Amino acid sequence: MNTHWPLPANDTWSTPFAQALIKELDLFPGAQVLDIAAGGGIPAFYIAEQVGPDGRVLAIDINQRQILHARSSQGSHLPWLQFEAGDMRFLPPTLPQFDRITGNISFMFFRPDRSQALGNLLKFLKPGGQIVLTFPSLGTFDSLWTRVKNEMAERKLDTERQALDEYIAERPSADHARKWLQELGMEKVEVTESPLEVPTGPGREFLEHPLLRGGFLDDVYECFQDQGLAEEFMTAISRDTASFTPLYAQRCVMSGWAAPKKSKT
């Protein structure tokens, strides 16, 4: 099917996750869709085009700047697509139920209690509806974390290493996703993982990598009370990228279906 709103080919992070989401998502014309952690609209624009003018897509994100950017990109197109600022963990109870709930690179933000946040979100899924979420699961960039922990051990940075271990242990796994969907009564639960390479070079290219520094490397910096030491430490790591590249993320897709409404006898 030709589309005027394809997934951006130049986005090497959000688009591969969105492709995995769409592959699992069972869309139909006229569907009512709630898209959480919508960011700049990947894949909300694509989904809106698929459901068509008889459908509706409500795309929410906690970042007002992202919402304004998405609205600017939208202009007067796809009027059945609505971008709104909001926290997916605290949706208003007056919100209607939807045929589908989607969230690209979203599940790791369901802090602090992911099971509870997922349960709250599922209240907005119609009986017989489908939820599909993606996230970088536990195991993402393991080669980097191993290199960092080895360096911390060599330097006897025990406090920093303990903090890093806590960050890594907090990341959700595919097994967590499967368990929580099943415990919340979802049917036809499917959770899959596939590797996604994230290219990077040494030195400043690594330290200032827009994806890595925007989330993952910050976790290392936050382990240090002394940010001068953190910078010196990470500079040393950046000179040794050959020891932990290629870097691979675990691209996880979690899907489940709400039980259909029981017919009256």
Where do the language-model regions lie?
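Conserved alpha-helix/loop element of class I SAM-dependent methyltransferases that forms part
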Residues: 12-29, 46
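Class I SAM-dependent methyltransferase SAM/SAH-binding core
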Residues: 34-36, 40-91
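Helix-to-beta-strand junctions that scaffold the AdoMet/dcAdoMet cofactor pocket
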Residues: 52, 110-111, 125-127
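A short acidic, Gly/Pro-enriched loop at the edge of an enzyme's catalytic core
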Residues: 89-101
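A short SAM/SAH-binding and catalytic strip from SAM-dependent methyltransferases
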Residues: 99-114
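A short glycine-rich, Lys/Arg-flanked "PGG" loop and its adjoining helix->strand segment in the class I
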Residues: 115-130
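Conserved catalytic/acceptor-binding region of the Class I
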Residues: 128-201
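C-terminal helical/coil "lid" or tail adjacent to the Rossmann-like core of SAM-dependent
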Residues: 190-245
